Amino acid sequence: MYLRKALIAGGSAAAAAAAILGAAAVGKSKGGPDLDILSVVPAATGQWDRNWDRREPISMVNLSKINGETGEEELQLHLNKHKPKATRHIFLIRHSQYKQDGKTDFDRVLTPLGREQADLTGKRLSSLGFKYNHIVYSTMTRAKETTEIISKYLPDVKKSSSDLLREGAPIRPEPQVCHWKPDFVYYEDGSRIEAAFRHFIHRADPKQEADSYEILICHANVIRYIVCRALQLPPEAWLRMFLNNGSISYLVIRPNGNVSLRMLGDSGFMPPEKISRT
């Protein structure tokens, strides 16, 4: 009976995946506009999708290889093999204040206040006492400079960069705002930022034994979109939140796929005169 239920669940997931991949292959959704596979964002339903990251153990097993009548013990072995054990702690840091009048990204360096903010954020992260595993930062100048300053307080933490975390317009916001953008902007940026979510935000690998503490240093739009997606809230709501420069948001992903938000845009560790939102 357990196996039969698993096969049904697996079949539903496979059918949904096949439908999406099929639509992507022909470049169009049924009766709709062009479809980019990375832009397919599940609609918020009010029900928690346990397999939101496609890493639920049952979806990691090739059910067609399991004997439908006698394979329950074999299935359980496979499920145990793919069951995560560790919790992932993910800190999302918005870059510090920068010179917005720069003509190119290279010119948009941190302001003196921005450097102070990054220093305060680095001290705050260090004071939390976590054993951080990795820092990943956006390749944009303001994020790179923020990372350099924060890293002074976390000298032994390895660092790497990712273009996926660059700033952009993830999805047309609701309610709509006055600074209109053409559809192609969301079409291009949205695919990349959705890819960033799928790449960085998921439950731990089954091989991971200990809890991990990871830092992503990037941009307000990226962080707000990731938070909406991680909590399975309508992603169009991303612009309803404000994040101060150098602020800390904190997601926790449990082995069973449950996600909680412990901080959103925390900048209470900064003196009031050091806070900005550029």
Swiss-Prot record:
| Modifications made to the protein after synthesis | Phosphorylated by the RIPK1/RIPK3 complex under necrotic conditions. This phosphorylation increases PGAM5 phosphatase activity.
Query: Known catalysed reaction(s)?
Result: O-phospho-L-seryl-[protein] + H2O = L-seryl-[protein] + phosphate; O-phospho-L-threonyl-[protein] + H2O = L-threonyl-[protein] + phosphate
Q: Which GO terms describe its biological process?
A: programmed cell death
The membrane-spanning stretches of this chain are 7-27
- InterPro entries registered for this protein in UniProt: His_Pase_superF_clade-1, His_PPase_superfam, Mito_Ser/Thr_phosphatase
GO MF terms held by the record: protein serine/threonine phosphatase activity
Q: What is its EC number?
A: 3.1.3.16
Identify its membrane topology class. Answer: Single-pass membrane protein
Using the UniProt record, name the top-level EC class of this enzyme in a single word.
Answer: hydrolase
Q: List the disulfide bonds.
A: none
Query: What is a single Pfam family found in this protein's UniProt entry?
Result: His_Phos_1
Taxonomy, superkingdom: Eukaryota
Predominant location category: mitochondrion
Q: Does the keyword Hydrolase apply?
A: yes
Q: What does this protein do?
A: Displays phosphatase activity for serine/threonine residues. Has apparently no phosphoglycerate mutase activity. May be regulator of mitochondrial dynamics. May be a central mediator for programmed necrosis.
**What's the family?**
Belongs to the phosphoglycerate mutase family. BPG-dependent PGAM subfamily.
Q: What is known of its domains?
A: The N-terminal 35 amino acids, including the potential transmembrane alpha-helix, function as a non-cleaved mitochondrial targeting sequence that targets the protein to the cytosolic side of the outer mitochondrial membrane.
Its recorded name reads Serine/threonine-protein phosphatase PGAM5, mitochondrial
Q: Which organism is it from?
A: Xenopus tropicalis (Western clawed frog)
Q: Which gene encodes it?
A: pgam5
